[in-house]
From Swiss-Prot:
Superkingdom: Viruses
Positions of transmembrane segments: 145-165
Cytoplasmic side: 166-183
Chain's role: Inhibits peptide loading of MHC class I molecules by transporters associated with antigen processing (TAP). Does not prevent peptide binding to TAP, but binds to the lumenal side of the TAP complex and inhibits peptide translocation by specifically blocking ATP-binding to TAP1, but not TAP2. Also prevents the conformational rearrangement of TAP induced by peptide binding. In consequence, infected cells are masked for immune recognition by cytotoxic T-lymphocytes.
Compartmental location: Host endoplasmic reticulum membrane
Protein name: Unique short US6 glycoprotein
Main localisation: host cell
Record-level GO BP terms: symbiont-mediated suppression of host antigen processing and presentation of peptide antigen via MHC class I
Disulfide bonds: 39-127
Subunit structure: Interacts with UL18.
Length: 183
């Protein structure tokens, strides 16, 4: 029960408050930890380049929208080179939805103040917000926190009841066997 209370507390802490930005907000999506950031490769048109160690960007006069489009293009190129063993999700009908998180993290721009284009945001939603943690958040967003907590409580209670029944059946069968042997 203590574990369930702690789990509920952690979920409450993880949920954004009404005044707080959502985890799917563009700025939040781009504000990943430095380990997840990578540099946009330098192109012939001399786009802004970031350095992983310092996070310093040069040639920042270029338009943010163009940088976002360049990043989206890099993501698509990376997706085309992905291994064929990678399974795409059933809802994905286009190449942009079948990107892997690792490829996107490798291509993320270092500058956290970038104003991304709509296409870039679509890529970020498909690539970064993927995996077990994001699926849990989506479940909470879809059904509500209390409904998900209720599902968890019911599931854990059902599991405990099943284990208790199995233990009691096992105990009764072994107890009768011991009595027979002793008589």
């Amino acid at each position: 029960m203590d574990l369930l209370i702690r789990l509920g507390f952690l979920l409450m802490c993880a949920l954004p408050t009404p005044g707080e930005r959502s985890s799917r907000d563009p700025k939040t999506l781009l504000s990943l930890s430095p380990r997840q950031q990578a540099c946009v490769p330098r192109t012939k048109s001399h786009r802004p380049v970031c350095y992983n160690d310092t996070g310093d960007c040069t040639d920042a006069d270029d338009s943010w929208k163009q940088l976002g489009e360049d990043f989206a293009h890099q993501c698509l190129q990376a997706a085309k080179k992905r291994p064929k063993t990678h399974k795409s999700r059933p809802n994905d009908r286009n190449l942009e939805g079948r990107l892997t998180c690792q490829r996107v993290r490798r291509l993320l721009p270092c500058d956290l103040d970038i104003h991304p284009s709509h296409r870039l945001l679509t890529l970020m939603n498909n690539c970064v917000c993927d995996g077990a943690v994001w699926n849990a958040f989506r479940l909470i967003e879809r059904h509500g926190f209390f409904a998900v907590t209720l599902y968890l409580c019911c599931g854990i209670t059902l599991l405990v009841v099943i284990l208790a029944l199995l233990c009691s059946i096992t105990y009764e069968s072994t107890g009768r066997g011991i009595r027979r042997c002793g008589s």
